[in-house]
Amino acid sequence: MTDRDTLFSAPIASLGDWTFDERVAEVFPDMIQRSVPGYSNIISMIGMLAERFVQPGTQVYDLGCSLGAATLSVRRNVHHQGCKIIAVDNSPAMVERCRRHLDAYKAPTPVDVIEGDIRTIEIKNASMVVLNFTLQFLEPDNRQLLLDKIYQGLNPGGALVLSEKFSFEDASVGELLFNMHHDFKRANGYSELEISQKRSMLENVMLTDSVEAHKARLHKAGFEHSELWFQCFNFGSLVALKGGQA
C-alpha cells in the first residue's frame, strides 16, 4: 500500500520548479498511476520487450529509474546467465526507495542502483536501454547527446525504449489530447487546484517533443528503425532498434 498523493490539495503560496524530492518519492507510485494514462501497460510491456531483446552476458540500463518499476519488470522477465541491470537516478530520495523496493523482490539478475547523472554514465555492452519518462526532463540541447551515447553503447540488435509525454504539431489534436489527459486526472480524483498547481511547477522543467521530433533524433543518433508502439492520449512509448544481429 502506497501513500496517496495529496501534495497539491491545498493552495501553495510560492510554487517553485518541480523536483523529485522526498515528498514526491513518498507518493510517487500513486501519483504516476493517477497522472500518466497507460503507465501500468508500458511497465508490463517493457518486461515483455526485455524478454525478447536482452541477451546472455549483457547489460540493461534503466536511465531515470525513479522507484525501479521498469527495472523490476525487466528483472522478472530476464532469465539469462550473466546479465546485469544498471538503474540510475539523480534523486537521492528516489534512489533510496528504489533500493528498498528491489531488495523486497529477490531475483537472480543483479541490479546496481546508482545515484548519478544519466548524461555522464558510461553505457557499454547493452542489449536494452530504458528511458521511461526521463528524456523530457533533460535540457533539449542534451537530448541528442544522450541518444548518441546510448546508440554507441548498444550492441547490434539492441533496443531502446523511450517513453514520453508528447506535444503535437496539429494544434487541434494537441488540445483534444491535453483535455482528455485532464479528464483522466479528474476521473482519478485530482481537483482542479491540484492539476493547476502541479502543471505550474512542471512547465519550466518538463519540455515535451512531438513523436516526429523524437524519431528525427533517434535517426540522427544512428538507430535504423524506430516506431511508436504504445500511446494513450498525449503519453506514449517508442522502441528504437540498432541494426545487426545480437
Swiss-Prot record:
GO molecular function: carboxyl- or carbamoyltransferase activity; S-adenosyl-L-methionine binding
UniProt-listed Pfam families: Methyltransf_25 (PF13649)
Keywords of this entry: S-adenosyl-L-methionine, Transferase
EC assignment: 2.1.3.-
GO biological process: tRNA wobble uridine modification
Binding site for S-adenosyl-L-methionine: Y39, G64, C65, S66, D89, N90, D117, I118, N132, R199
S-S bridge residues: none
Catalyzed reactions: prephenate + S-adenosyl-L-methionine = carboxy-S-adenosyl-L-methionine + 3-phenylpyruvate + H2O
Keyword Lipid metabolism set for record: no
InterPro entries assigned: CmoA, Methyltransf_25, SAM-dependent_MTases_sf
PANTHER family xref list: CARBOXY-S-ADENOSYL-L-METHIONINE SYNTHASE (PTHR43861:SF2), TRANS-ACONITATE 2-METHYLTRANSFERASE-RELATED (PTHR43861)
Assembly behavior: Homodimer.
Entry function: Catalyzes the conversion of S-adenosyl-L-methionine (SAM) to carboxy-S-adenosyl-L-methionine (Cx-SAM).
Family: Belongs to the class I-like SAM-binding methyltransferase superfamily. Cx-SAM synthase family.
Record's protein name: Carboxy-S-adenosyl-L-methionine synthase
Recorded name of the encoding gene: cmoA
